[in-house]
Amino acid sequence: MMGRQAATLAGLKPLRLFFHAPGIAAHRPKLSLPLITGAQTTTTDSIAGLYPNHMLTGNRGNIIHAEAPAKIFTKSPGGSTYGNLAEILQLIGADFATRMSRSFDMVIISMANFIRPDHDGTRLLSSLKALEDKIPVVVLGCGLQGNHKLSDMMPGNAALIEWFNQNAVIFGVRGEKTANWLHDNGFKNADVLGCPSLYAYPHSIMGLDGSSARAKGAAAEVMTAGYVKIANGAIAPRGVELARAFRKISASYVFQDEPWSFEELAQMRGLYNEGNNEFRADLLNDWLGQRAGGTLPFKRYYYFNEAGAWRHAALRHDVYIGDRFHGGVAALQAGVPAIFLSHDNRVAELTEHFGLPHLTTKAFARKGLPAVLEEYLSPEVMQAMKTLYRQRSREFFEVTARVGLTPAIQDLQVPEMAPAAPPVPFRQKMRRLARRFR
C-alpha cells in the first residue's frame, strides 16, 4: 500500500519531507508556536560546556550523513523539517499518526551502522509502527558493524530490521556486505545504495584533483581523524598507531566523540575556542602524549558544531588521510581528495562501494606520505573513482525516483583525464612562444 502511495507522489512537488536525524546541532523547541526554529547552544570554552551541544547529534560524523538527504532532494522548504519520531510520538500521543500524515508526504531516515548488538531500536520502532500504512518511509545508509549473528541483536533492533524490510518503501543499505548479511538472515528487500553523504555535493566529487597534493609530497598539509581517545587511562592502540604514523607530517586532527574520554580536562576553561572550532594543540599534544608514550604531532585539533565549518576547515589542507569515514566525506564534499585508513567492515564496505582509495594505517606508515599520495591520488585512480561514482549516483537516483524523490543536481559527466604532464615537444613550443614576447 505504501509503495503505491509513494509512487503517486512523483507528480506532487515540492514534497513535504520529514528527516529523522539530527543534521544540525540545534535545540528542539518545546513550544507549540508556528514559524520558530531551535536555538544554538551558548558559546563555551570547555569540554564539559560542549557536552550538551554534542548530545544534540552524538558522534559528529552523524551530521555529515544526516544532513545529506535534506541537501540532495528537492522539497518544500517551509514544509520540511528535521525531527525525532520517537520524541514526537511521546509528546503528542494518540494523534501522532494523523498529524504526521497530514503534515508530511514522506519520512526519510538516515541510519548509519545500526546493525550491531549494542543498538536498541525499540523507541524508533514504536513510532514507525504507529505510522504504518499512514505515510511512506524511506531508510538510507543502513550498515553492518562487525559480523554478528541476528540472535546477538537486541530484540528491538532485530524487530526494527524486520520492519524496515517489510514496510520501508526504500530499504537502502551501505554495501554488499550488509546486503548479504540481511539476505542470509531472511531480509531480502534491501537496495545497495551506499551512504547518502556522497551524493550531497556531486560537483565537488567530480572536481577532485590529486595533483597539488602529489606535487607537495612530504610537505602536504593533511587533515586526519581516528580514535585518539582514552580507555583505561591510556590512548587506545588504534589511536597510538595513527599518531605515530603522522610523526613527521604536518597534520590537523578532527575529533568526533573523543573529548568525552578526557575526564581530567573536562572543566578546564579556555581549552576550546568555538570561534575557530579548535582545541589548544599545545596542551593536548603534551597531555595526550603522556598517555601515548610520546608527544603527539598534530598542529590543530578540531571539533565542529556544524558541517559547513568542517568542510571549510578541510580547504586549509591538501588531502584527508584518516581512520573515520565521514571525516573523509567532509573533505570530499569540499573538493579535497581523501584517502581512507581502513580497519573494519564499516569503512571497507563504503570505500569499496564507491571505489575510494584506502589502505591500513600500518601500510600508510610503511609507504610514507609522498609514495601514498603518488599511488592513491594518481590521475588513473581518480578517474576510475569518478567513473564508478557516476554509476553509483545513477543507481541511487533510479531507486529514489521510484518513490517520487528528485535530486536537484544529477547526471554529471565524468571529466576527461588530463595528461600527467605536457608532452616534451609541446613544452618546447611554449618556451619558444614565450621568448617571442619577452
Where do the model's predicted regions map?
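Active-site anion-handling motifs in enzyme catalytic cores
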Residues: M2-R438
